[in-house]
Amino acid sequence: MALSQNQAKFSKGFVVMIWVLFIACAITSTEASLTKCQQLQASANSGLIGAYVPQCKETGEFEEKQCWGSTGYCWCVDEDGKEILGTKIRGSPDCSRRKAALTLCQMMQAIIVNVPGWCGPPSCKADGSFDEVQCCASNGECYCVDKKGKELEGTRQQGRPTCERHLSECEEARIKAHSNSLRVEMFVPECFEDGSYNPVQCWPSTGYCWCVDEGGVKVPGSDVRFKRPTC
């Protein structure tokens, strides 16, 4: 028995609806099988050229280190792919230490925001220390800093300056002690090769040794005589 015109239209529409539902279910099933990282990766790959594309492991989880190739920046992420504050640098951060305590540079990087007229967050090395050269994105000025991130006077200029290693506080104190014209034996601080204070300081003429902090300040109660304390 031949189908009426209305029946034929209904039958055709029903078939189309079934196909639409089938395709929708297939797409939903495919998306459901993808991890969050893979979904974001697929979405980014279909977007603008040069956009950030998440890097995923073979298992679908986020790689601990994420990089944005067009900018040269890399950073560490948690299991949900969220950036761990203070880890973004130009180059390759050490994300095996991502749960370790942040360095001063990383903490400043995490809390300082880009404000017009300000230099913005500092640039940190892979080990978390300050880059010798810091630059202001707002005006293109760059300058040299010490190990604590403090600007070295006379180094600010347009473009990147050549930042030779300057004398540290410990090295300056050591030179000053050696140049003293008095014959009395002065205390001469002990410095490491990188210019930082040796945590154990001694005054040979008195026989005393003591512990100091990173700034060379004596730790109260650490004085001992005729031996080196454990600092």
Curated annotation (Swiss-Prot):
Disulfide-linked positions: 37-56, 67-74, 76-95, 105-124, 135-142, 144-163, 170-191, 202-209, 211-231
Top-rank taxon, per record: Eukaryota
Main location: secreted
GO MF annotations, alphabetized: cysteine-type endopeptidase inhibitor activity
Pfam families, alphabetized: Thyroglobulin_1
Record InterPro entries: Dev_reg/Prot_inhib, Thyroglobulin_1, Thyroglobulin_1_sf
Secretion signal, residue range per the UniProt entry: 1-32
GO cellular component: extracellular space
Keywords recorded for this protein, A-Z: Disulfide bond, Protease inhibitor, Repeat, Secreted, Signal, Thiol protease inhibitor
Family according to the record: Belongs to the protease inhibitor I31 family.
Role of this protein: Potent inhibitor of papain-like cysteine proteinases (Ki=0.18-0.57 nM on papain), as well as of the aspartic proteinase cathepsin D (Ki=0.3-05 nM).
Protein name, as recorded: Equistatin
Originating species: Actinia equina
